[in-house]
Regions:
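Active-site/ligand-binding-proximal alpha/beta "capping" segment
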Residues: 51-105
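Hydrophobic alpha-helical segments that mediate membrane insertion or helix-helix packing
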Residues: 4-5, 72, 112, 116
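Structured adenosyl-cofactor binding patch, chiefly the S-adenosyl-L-methionine
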Residues: 13-24, 82-124
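Active-site-adjacent beta-strand anchor residues
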Residues: 33, 74, 110
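RNA substrate-binding interface of SAM-dependent RNA methyltransferases
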Residues: 1-56
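Generic hydrophobic alpha-helical scaffold/packing signal
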Residues: 32, 37-40, 44, 57, ...
Length: 124
């Protein structure tokens, strides 16, 4: 990961709880606060794939993934906005391992990010 892009509604990456949770890793990447719709449009025009994480996306373990691009992680409570969803080229999901209908609907965004990044790295 070289860059993290945040919108105005994102939790402050330098919030003490965020810094502690990252174990200092936040200081090894470049962080930008930006207008995400503008950024995503620019990156798509440059040919970079934009992946989004959704409850109704394609299974991350069986979907073709790129070795480059941008991954959008949604807010834990609200998910990804409709505006940002329209700019994602591929919708991904982490499948539930529950064998019954009482599965978890969503994961903590930090846990979900770790799982998603791990799968991209595994495929490199």
């Amino acid at each position: 990961i070289g860059n993290i892009f945040c919108d105005a509604d994102c939790a402050g990456v330098y919030n003490p709880k965020c810094v502690q949770a990252s174990m200092g890793a936040i200081f090894r990447v470049k962080t930008f606060y930006t207008d995400l719709p503008v950024l995503l449009n620019e990156l798509k025009q440059e040919g970079l794939p934009v992946f989004g994480t959704f409850l109704d996306g394609k299974n991350i373990y069986t979907t073709a993934l790129s070795t480059r691009g941008l991954i959008v992680m949604g807010n834990e409570g609200k998910g990804i906005s409709a505006e940002i969803e329209a700019l994602t080229g591929q919708k991904l999901t982490i499948p539930s391992f529950a064998r019954n209908s009482e599965s978890t609907e969503s994961l903590n965004v930090g846990v979900a990010t770790g799982i998603i990044l791990s799968e991209f790295k595994r495929r490199m």
